[in-house]
């Protein structure tokens, strides 16, 4: 069995990208070519992506939009609090993490951004229900702060408000960006269209749990966070058409991957074909998982000991990912949300846990 230490690596801190590059497509792209063994590592720039994809392939994007989900405020007693909205659950309600010297009880009033009051409702572990005095999304957009990842050391600014969103973000609800999509700009999307590459979207609202490291040595004991996704019928139809013409389904980001594979696994378990789905998923993809939909994956470089590093290791092979990450560190690639990208191809047979 694989253990947590199998997914650890030492990253020089200066390789953690703190800001976005001036141009989205200026990022580097490490292509992991599995047509040979061992896999060949090809250093590219992201603008070269169209040369790596064939006409008739399908790119699947996550169109979630990052909320300005972080608030600073205070209790009626004057005690300082920090609130991170995890999920909007209704027009006037949301689930949130609350940092405070003492957890607020139900019925407590909290003042946020020195602008409005929310009331604490029932606890839904590990979150608190918050009741807003006006539509949540309006207040979040007007008064909230962009929740940059914990490893980005500057406060969010106007540049982040543009660059920590994809150009196609349209469904508000995430508290972290689907970062593989940050490399695409409109000219690149139009270039892909002109080449005959198909595009489709789904929605998965990325939760703060995406940054949580695994803390148990036996990774099978890890409790995965849950996220909501919407896989529309139009995407199901495009996947079927792509399969019929022999094209590849290419997930743009691990969030697109998780939604696609969650829906496909549920369909398999129910003995039916892939169908339009709106559901929660806590799918935890580790080596040994049998991929059902995704053939290739565009993804950024992930944190040590993270569930996403385990996912890409399951997809491309543990040793392949180790070699790719060693190469990326030697070649000074930029890591994490504002960093560079990889293009991976699925390992043909699932890797047995511990193999």
Curated annotation (Swiss-Prot):
Substrates-to-products reaction catalysed: 7-aminomethyl-7-carbaguanosine(34) in tRNA + S-adenosyl-L-methionine = epoxyqueuosine(34) in tRNA + adenine + L-methionine + 2 H(+)
Cross-referenced SUPFAM superfamilies: QueA-like
Transmembrane residue ranges: none
Coiled coil residues, start to end: none
InterPro entries tied to this protein: QueA, QueA_dom1, QueA_dom2, QueA_sf
Subcellular location: Cytoplasm
One term under GO cellular component: cytoplasm
Similarity comment text for this entry: Belongs to the QueA family.
HAMAP family: QueA
Purpose of the protein: Transfers and isomerizes the ribose moiety from AdoMet to the 7-aminomethyl group of 7-deazaguanine (preQ1-tRNA) to give epoxyqueuosine (oQ-tRNA).
Oligomer and partners: Monomer.
Protein name from the UniProt record: S-adenosylmethionine:tRNA ribosyltransferase-isomerase
Organism: Burkholderia cenocepacia (strain ATCC BAA-245 / DSM 16553 / LMG 16656 / NCTC 13227 / J2315 / CF5610)
